[in-house]
Amino acid sequence: MGHMVNANYQIDEFVNLGANSIETDVSFDSSANPEYTYHGVPCDCRRWCKKWEYFNNFLKALRKATTPGDSKYHEKLVLVVFDLKAGSLYDNQAYDAGKKLAKNLLQHYWNNGNNGGRAYIVLSIPNLAHYKLITGFKETLKTEGHPELMEKVGYDFSGNDSIDQVANAYKKAGVTGRVWQSDGITNCVASFIRGLDRAKKAVKNRDSSNGYINKVYYWTVDKYATTREALDIGVDGIMTNYPDVIANVLNESAYKEKFRLATYDDNPWETFKN
């Protein structure tokens, strides 16, 4: 999963390095409109934090990259995580943010349901109090006549809240599936300081008979040793600034029989247990 892909040209760059998924930051204006694909300072070490596009222009480029037959099409690119930088919004704006996000995706990415981009989408929300963003997104697609597109959409609460608190937020939002759970820390902090305890709890929830999690991914992993540690606990995805590092580890004898990069034929909402 290629991290912080916010300029159009970076789509090609990260896929060519081996990524089958990208993560893109989405900032909002004061009226809860998605405005830019932009991270800003601070960000991961050894990355330029200020690359950006207008959100709708990025969606159009992403659509071309994920539409079979287009000259810019990448068959390998099957999943996009939108990291929704909604920290500037009030809690009571979350529904509107979801509504406006859905309308933008419907028009500029899904092409109003007419041969739009085919990638699966994960809406990654940092604040549990913004669970109504999910509600606004779902209800808008239904109102606009395209409820079937929700089959392409999953969810992630990306804060470091307890697993139980996250489960409660999903309950409030009426979410019963298609859940990706993230865990991690910036690459500027040594991974051993943070540790894998919360990621292990997420994997345990995924593997339990009554868990809410379908997939677990870990970020931001740039080192070979940390990649192996994450794979050893059974995560489903790894977010990285260096997709070639992940690809190289997956080709090692200890991992190539158990793991592979997902393709479009794989179901990103299906649970695989340890």
Curated annotation (Swiss-Prot):
Expressed by the venom gland. Its EC number is 4.6.1.-. Pfam families: GDPD_2. Mg(2+) binds at residues 23, 25, 83. It catalyses: an N-(acyl)-sphingosylphosphocholine = an N-(acyl)-sphingosyl-1,3-cyclic phosphate + choline; an N-(acyl)-sphingosylphosphoethanolamine = an N-(acyl)-sphingosyl-1,3-cyclic phosphate + ethanolamine; a 1-acyl-sn-glycero-3-phosphocholine = a 1-acyl-sn-glycero-2,3-cyclic phosphate + choline; a 1-acyl-sn-glycero-3-phosphoethanolamine = a 1-acyl-sn-glycero-2,3-cyclic phosphate + ethanolamine. GO terms for biological process: killing of cells of another organism; lipid catabolic process. Glycans are attached at residue 251. Keywords: Cytolysis, Dermonecrotic toxin, Disulfide bond, Glycoprotein, Hemolysis, Lipid degradation, Lipid metabolism, Lyase, Magnesium, Metal-binding, Secreted, Toxin. GO terms for cellular component: extracellular region. It is found in: Secreted. The keyword rRNA-binding does not apply. Its cofactor is Mg(2+). It comes from the Eukaryota. Its main location: secreted. InterPro entries: PLC-like_Pdiesterase_TIM-brl. Belongs to the arthropod phospholipase D family. Class II subfamily. This is Dermonecrotic toxin LarSicTox-alphaIB2bii. It comes from Loxosceles arizonica.
